[in-house]
A protein has these predicted regions:
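Secretory targeting and sorting signals
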Residues: 1-27
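Post-signal peptide N-terminal regions of Sec-secreted extracellular proteins
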Residues: 26-151
Length: 151
């Protein structure tokens, strides 16, 4: 009986994030359209030193599920090259992953994001993300604000 309860508890820890988030939003290493919600805790839109582009790093916290997200917005009319070789998630100041979002082209007027894997963390954990963006060959690092899980 105790064994069955432990197995059920373990299974629920794996299933709950899928129910709460509708599945994981892991799209790395590819860029995709994004719609931010109140679960996104993001840096300011940082002007990139090239061509009407802003970059932003976010940590998404939804109860005990979390992930790092990097966002690039092209406010100009010309396409730009972009990549994010480092999308890092930190738990209480310790890095838990460093993902690579592949090189791509972003057309003028578009915004794209790269979602790193979703992780389950306890409510006591404080999360933040770092993103390293390379746009048109210029690199910049941007840090998200910290966010406590379950808030």
């Amino acid at each position: 009986m105790v064994r069955a309860l432990k197995a059920l508890l373990s299974l629920s820890v794996l299933i709950v994030p899928f129910i709460l988030l509708g599945g994981t939003a892991n799209a790395d290493p590819y860029w995709q359209a994004v719609t931010k919600t109140n679960k996104f805790h993001c840096s300011a839109q940082v002007p990139h030193p090239s061509y009407n582009v802003t970059v932003q790093t976010c940590v998404v916290v939804n109860s005990t599920a979390t992930q790092a997200v990097v966002i690039v917005a092209n406010h100009g009319t010309a396409a730009v090259s972009l990549e994010a070789p480092h999308v890092e998630l930190y738990v209480n100041g310790t890095i838990t992953y460093d993902r690579n979002c592949l090189a791509s082209t972003l057309s003028g007027g578009y915004t794209r994001a790269c979602f790193a894997p979703t992780q389950v963390r306890p409510c006591s954990a404080v999360m933040h993300a770092w993103g390293n963006f390379i746009v048109q060959g210029y690199a910049v690092w941007v840090r998200s604000p910290g966010r406590q899980m379950c808030t």
